[in-house]
């Protein structure tokens, strides 16, 4: 375990064996006064694509989610732990897709998909228990949040439905469920969330890129919007109350960490607001 201090907020690093026997980096951002309050327990936000969470220099796009300055500068949120789980590199696509892709998409993308169920089980049965055992968390679902973007958003939505008694708030940015839309919506329909689960759904109107367009028979910008709309509608049709849902379609925003970072504070405010 390594300990670093940046912006007066301590980050601790652990390496946990993943479902395939590989060492996976998991970092925990702690409140600055964590060591001073030995009896205090904290809510936890679990985030995927952990390489992109804290520092722009190691983020895939060159821009992180900027969570350290956000938490340092914002006083309206309760103190919390941020758990950043690194993705599996080249195996990221497989790990964040719960269902195998169609043969056509497998050929186009070069990945088969379908390892998301194993990954999700690892997060719930290995990572979360480890964090709860080694840190002063509030382990109940009300204080357990999960957030991610793109395919990371897909795995968040899946985990919310697969483990409704674990996660009380979901942050789903630029949902890329279009890679397996039918299977995704069918699963969500048949695995309802707890009635008070909060779901923040954000998508921009300029999400698509050339890679996405090559995989789709329609406008890739619209594909991302449709995925978010269909997910939102499926939750409503399943009886989820609108007060616990927040769908945001943001003009001109793109598939990029900058835009997710710009609104992460709003996800946290929504999650921690009293109903």
Where are these regions (language model features)?
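Non-catalytic cap/lid and distal C-terminal segments of serine-dependent acyl enzymes
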Residues: 1-275
């Amino acid at each position: 375990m390594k300990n670093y201090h940046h912006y007066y907020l301590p980050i601790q690093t652990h390496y946990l064996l993943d479902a395939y026997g590989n060492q996976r980096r998991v970092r925990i951002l702690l409140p600055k006064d964590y060591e001073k309050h030995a009896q205090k327990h904290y809510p936890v936000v679990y985030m995927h694509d952990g390489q992109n969470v804290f520092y722009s220099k190691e983020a895939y796009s060159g821009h992180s989610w900027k969570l350290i300055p956000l938490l340092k500068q914002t006083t309206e949120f309760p103190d919390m732990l941020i758990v950043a789980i690194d993705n599996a590199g080249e195996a990221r696509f497989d790990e964040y897709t719960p269902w195998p892709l169609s043969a056509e998409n497998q050929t186009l993308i070069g990945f088969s998909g379908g390892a998301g169920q194993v990954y999700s089980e690892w997060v719930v049965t290995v990572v979360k228990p480890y964090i709860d055992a080694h840190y002063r968390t509030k382990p109940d679902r009300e204080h357990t949040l999960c957030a991610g973007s793109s395919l990371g958003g897909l795995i968040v939505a899946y985990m919310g439905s697969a483990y409704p008694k674990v996660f009380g708030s979901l942050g789903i940015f630029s949902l890329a469920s279009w890679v397996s839309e039918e299977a995704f919506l069918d699963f969500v329909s048949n695995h309802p969330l707890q009635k008070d689960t909060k779901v923040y759904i954000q998508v921009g109107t300029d999400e698509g890129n050339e890679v996405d367009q090559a995989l789709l028979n329609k406008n890739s910008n619209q594909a991302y919007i449709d995925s978010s709309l269909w997910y939102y509608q499926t939750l409503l049709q399943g009886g989820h109350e609108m007060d616990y849902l927040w769908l945001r379609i943001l003009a001109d925003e793109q598939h990029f960490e900058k835009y997710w970072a710009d609104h992460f504070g709003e996800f946290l405010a929504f999650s921690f607001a009293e109903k």
